[in-house]
Curated annotation (Swiss-Prot):
Residue stretches making up the SCA7 domain: 190-256
Protein name: SAGA complex subunit Sgf73
Gene Ontology cellular-component terms listed: chromatin; DUBm complex; nucleus; SAGA complex
Function: Component of the transcription coactivator SAGA complex. SAGA acts as a general cofactor required for essentially all RNA polymerase II transcription. At the promoters, SAGA is required for transcription pre-initiation complex (PIC) recruitment. It influences RNA polymerase II transcriptional activity through different activities such as TBP interaction (via core/TAF module) and promoter selectivity, interaction with transcription activators (via Tra1/SPT module), and chromatin modification through histone acetylation (via HAT module) and deubiquitination (via DUB module).
Gene from which the chain derives: sgf73
Gene3D superfamilies: 6.10.140.1270
Lineage of the species this protein comes from: Eukaryota, Fungi, Dikarya, Ascomycota, Taphrinomycotina
Amino acid sequence: MLTEQQTLELFPENWERNEQVLLKYPDGLPKDVLADQRVDNTESQVKDEITSNITNQTQILLPADSFPQYGSYPNNSELDYVVCTKCDRPFLSEYIEDHHSSCNGIKPPKPQFEPVANSQVLNKDVNNGNNAPIKNGVKSTAKGSAGNHEKNSVNGQKNPEMPPKRRKTEENKKPTKSALPKKEASKKKNPKVKGPVDVEKQCGVLLPNGQMCARSLTCKTHSMSSKRAVPGRSQPYDVLLAACQKKNQVKIQRQILETAKESEDNQHQAPVDSDEEVSFIMNVLQKSGNQPLEQKVFLPVKRRHSYFRTRELIAAAFRHGEQGMQVTGTILGRVIPFSARQPL
């Protein structure tokens, strides 16, 4: 502890210790000031208790505004989240009514990603740097502008004098003549050479360019008289045209027969369905007389013979012994002419 003399030596100030002190409230503090001080003291005590409790506890109390998102006890309770269809924000299922009442339907903004520059262009810029030659003494100005740009960037300002550099990418490069494929050049250089016109099989009418028409004998662009007047044919035009039409008909018939054979082969080669085959056979049997293959006998043979014997006995009783009588009448017409007394 410093003595009074030492303190005066350290702080040489002109003041007297016995100086009279004037008080603001000589009679004591009023009631209003005392009440305010008490309220301030109680608030400070409550804050100190809360901070002490928070420091002692491991969990931190959440405000009431964050209950719809995290719940009152997020570490102890199981949270059931629901995503809103209007604003795409998650909230607890307990607060669905409160959220619908306060939901405005505005979705949160999506993060915008900047496009990544071409790696080849960046590598070229890094490798080149400032080593590229600049004509007409522009290199010094470029360096000066670059220095100014760096200073302005450090100070947080952009240099308006620096124009943006334009670089050509590989996509913007136009293909040169040497890059064209060799096949296209060969096609242009080597046109097709037309052969001589066969008058026996082709039209042969002279065209305005001095060449002969290379269409077939059935050419529809030229008239029949002009086609008949073509020289150099061994036979008349009509005979050659008829022979050509016959050949075409034979070809058409051959094609028809070939297609028919192919269709038959395809039908035989196709897989047979058992259900279709059964249905086909049943339809054929129904349409072939409607008679079963085996008939059921409703009356045995022995009983049928007994019926015949009784019928003959009755018929003989009605005849009164006349054996040469003609078999006519309702009853006698159904009688078999053999003796009923003789056993069968």
